Design a protein with these regions (language model features):
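C-terminal motif of bacterial Sec signal peptides marking the signal peptidase cleavage site
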Residues: 18-21
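Sec-exported extracytoplasmic/periplasmic mature domains
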Residues: 102, 106-110, 197-204
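Short secondary-structure boundary motifs at beta->alpha junctions and helix caps
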Residues: 71, 77-88, 156-191, 195
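Surface-exposed short loop/turn segments
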Residues: 24-43, 107-158, 173-175
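Bacterial N-terminal signal peptides that target proteins for export
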Residues: 1-11
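Extracytoplasmic/secreted envelope proteins and their assembly/folding machinery
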Residues: 94, 98-102, 186-189, 193, ...
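A structural "domain/chain start" motif
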Residues: 23-94, 203-204
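Soluble periplasmic/extracytoplasmic beta-strand elements of cell-envelope proteins
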Residues: 53-59, 71, 125-129, 145-151, ...
């Protein structure tokens, strides 16, 4: 009886110490990131190149890029894509891109009016597709990579495609901190939009 009691006390002590060790390791907190402040417009049109009401569709993306978890790749060819468990965007990348497009295009006077909602009286529709929205780490150096397809259609229904382009930007983060990667994403996205606006000017 004494041996059994001693064994039970020893077991309880081991369990208690194990639990104490586990509880001493803090669980990482979730962190959320947004796009940075809008930059000063690099281009403002005297007259809108899109002569009418423009609707910005919700950007399309593969399933994994419609979620808020930040994606990353560390292999040399960037074939394998993973997701961070504790780092999230404030909104999914399609909504981040749509919001940034609306804000930047309005500041640039790119269209007579710009809307995100469905409306039968729009004259143009801007459709985008996110191909990459990833944090890429090469030799310990983190970069933000954004790859987007852009198509501008006439009419409310899918009419004629009057503009079509693809843009890819890679911006190195200032450090390996995730907050600096988020800032790099903001700069990369603004570079994509700047290129789109500069090409839009002479295409319509």
């Amino acid at each position: 009886m004494v041996a059994i009691q001693s064994l039970s006390l020893t077991t309880l002590l081991v369990v208690a110490l194990t639990l104490a060790g586990c509880s001493s390791t803090p669980v990482p907190e979730d962190s959320f990131y947004r796009m940075g402040n809008l930059p000063e417009p690099s281009l403002v049109f005297d007259s809108p190149p899109v002569d009418g009401r423009l609707m910005i569709e919700v950007p399309r993306a593969a399933g994994i890029r419609r979620q808020r978890g930040i994606l990353y790749s560390e292999d040399e060819d960037h074939v394998e894509v993973r997701r961070y468990y504790y780092h999230f965007w404030e909104e999914p990348p399609p909504q981040l891109l749509q919001r940034r497009l609306i804000e930047r295009l309005r500041l640039a006077n790119a269209a007579v009016s710009i809307t995100e909602g469905l409306s039968s009286d729009v004259n143009y529709r801007l459709r985008t597709r996110i191909r990459e929205f990833d944090r890429v780490v090469d030799a310990g150096v983190a970069s933000a990579v954004i790859d987007v397809d852009v198509i501008l259609f006439t009419g409310f229904a899918e009419g004629e495609a009057v503009f079509r382009a693809s843009y890819r930007e890679q911006v190195q983060a200032e450090s390996d901190l995730m907050v600096d990667t988020a800032s790099a994403f903001s700069r990369a996205l603004d570079e994509v939009i700047d290129r789109f606006l500069s090409e839009l000017e002479g295409s319509l």
